């Protein structure tokens, strides 16, 4: 389904929060949206693996890595796991790696930066907790919308039918 965050802001500005423009797109899909699932972890991605093994249809994983860019929280293997399980997208407040492979995958991925160093594989962190970055607090069950222009957040799903009637 087509989305345009600029048009969504024109219509729903009073209902959405706009994430600060600190993210770049690294996935093969430029527009994505879905219900938020959150994980908070620092330089390890064991919990991320556990979450991405779940059915991700209609869901976007928000990863609060503390803004650290010393280790990549998402790589090609995890992104492929997300694709295989139907996730709509991943937003990483941290780093990703294996960018050439990520760009070929059928998933949206936004992150702060690339780095070649991988994360530890420990299951340390918290799942489904509020996370705050980019000037916005993300709650589990919120709805996030992302494209190349930006990322916006809503407590309720936004009506998208008018964008897809053309």
UniProtKB/Swiss-Prot annotation:
Pfam family for this entry, one: RraA-like
Major subcellular location class: cytoplasm
Keyword Cell membrane attributed: no
Transmembrane portions of the chain: none
Record-level GO BP terms: regulation of RNA metabolic process
Signal peptide interval: none
GO cellular component terms attached to this protein's record: cytoplasm
Entry keywords, A to Z: Cytoplasm
InterPro entries: RraA (IPR010203), RraA/RraA-like (IPR005493), RraA/RraA-like_sf (IPR036704), RraA_gpbac (IPR014339)
Superkingdom per UniProt: Bacteria
Subcellular location: Cytoplasm
GO molecular function: endoribonuclease inhibitor activity; enzyme binding
Family (UniProt): Belongs to the RraA family.
Function of the protein: Globally modulates RNA abundance by binding to RNase E (Rne) and regulating its endonucleolytic activity. Can modulate Rne action in a substrate-dependent manner by altering the composition of the degradosome. Modulates RNA-binding and helicase activities of the degradosome.
HAMAP family on file: RraA (MF_00471)
Subunit: Homotrimer. Binds to both RNA-binding sites in the C-terminal region of Rne and to RhlB.
Protein name: Regulator of ribonuclease activity A
Gene name per UniProt: rraA
